[in-house]
C-alpha cells in the first residue's frame, strides 16, 4: 500500500480532489440561475452604447465632486465622456480612462520595478561579498595547514 494511502488504496489527496470537484460543481449549479436573473435585469436598463454605435460628443474629462457623487459612471475611473448613441439618439455618459491617468500609472509601475530591481541588486552584491569572504577564509586555512 502507498504511504499516506487511505483504507481503499486511494491516496488522501485523491479524496480531497474528489471533494473539491464535487463542491465546485455544486457551487456552479447553485449560482447558474442567479447569474441568468442578473443578466436579464441588467439588459433591460443597459446603456445604449453597449448595443449601438455611438459618437463621442465630449472627450474624456475628469469628474467634478458633484458628478462623482451622483453619476455612477464616474465611480470606477473618475473620468467620463459624453456620448450620443446613433440609433436611439440618447445622450449618456460613459466611463473612460484618461491618457494622463494611464501615463501616471505607467510611471508609478516603472518606479516600483526599478526600486525592486535595486533592492535585489544590493542583495546580490551583499551575498557575493559574503561568499567571497568564505572562499578566502577557506583558502587561508588551507594555506595555513600546509
From Swiss-Prot:
One GO cellular component assignment for this chain's record is: midbody
Residue ranges that the Swiss-Prot or TrEMBL entry lists as coiled coil: none
Q: Which domain of life is it from?
A: Eukaryota
Per the record, ranges on the Extracellular side are: 31-105
Q: Which residues lie on this side of the membrane: Cytoplasmic?
A: 127-146
The transmembrane residues are: 106-126
Q: Which GO terms describe its molecular function?
A: protein kinase binding
Q: How does it sit in the membrane?
A: Single-pass type I membrane protein
Q: Does the keyword Mitochondrion apply?
A: yes
Q: Where is the signal peptide?
A: 1-30
One GO BP: apoptotic mitochondrial changes
Keyword field contains Metal-binding: no
Q: Where in the cell is it found?
A: Membrane; Mitochondrion; Cytoplasm; Cytoplasm, Cytoskeleton, Microtubule organizing center, Centrosome
Outline the inducing conditions: Up-regulated by TGFB1 in mammary epithelial cells.
Could you give the subunit structure recorded for this chain? Interacts with AURKA, AURKB, BIRC5 and INCENP. May be a component of the CPC at least composed of BIRC5/survivin, CDCA8/borealin, INCENP and AURKB/Aurora-B.
Provide the family line: Belongs to the JTB family.
Q: What does the UniProt record say this protein does?
A: Required for normal cytokinesis during mitosis. Plays a role in the regulation of cell proliferation. May be a component of the chromosomal passenger complex (CPC), a complex that acts as a key regulator of mitosis. The CPC complex has essential functions at the centromere in ensuring correct chromosome alignment and segregation and is required for chromatin-induced microtubule stabilization and spindle assembly. Increases AURKB activity. Inhibits apoptosis induced by TGFB1. Overexpression induces swelling of mitochondria and reduces mitochondrial membrane potential.
Question: What's this protein's name?
Answer: Protein JTB
Organism of provenance: Mus musculus
Q: Which gene codes for it?
A: Jtb
Amino acid at each position: 500500500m502507498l504511504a499516506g494511502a487511505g483504507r481503499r488504496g486511494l491516496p488522501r489527496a485523491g479524496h480531497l480532489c474528489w471533494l473539491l470537484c464535487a463542491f465546485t460543481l455544486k457551487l456552479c449549479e447553485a449560482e447558474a440561475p442567479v447569474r441568468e436573473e442578473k443578466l436579464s435585469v441588467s439588459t433591460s436598463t443597459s446603456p445604449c452604447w453597449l448595443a449601438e454605435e455611438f459618437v463621442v460628443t465630449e472627450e474624456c474629462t475628469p469628474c467634478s465632486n458633484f458628478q462623482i457623487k451622483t453619476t455612477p459612471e464616474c465611480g470606477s475611473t473618475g473620468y467620463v465622456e459624453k456620448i450620443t448613441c446613433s440609433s436611439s439618439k440618447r445622450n449618456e455618459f460613459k466611463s473612460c480612462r484618461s491618457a494622463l491617468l494611464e501615463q501616471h500609472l505607467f510611471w508609478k509601475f516603472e518606479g516600483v520595478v526599478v526600486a525592486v530591481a535595486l533592492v535585489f541588486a544590493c542583495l546580490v552584491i551583499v551575498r557575493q561579498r559574503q561568499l567571497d569572504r568564505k572562499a578566502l577564509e577557506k583558502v587561508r586555512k588551507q594555506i595555513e595547514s600546509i
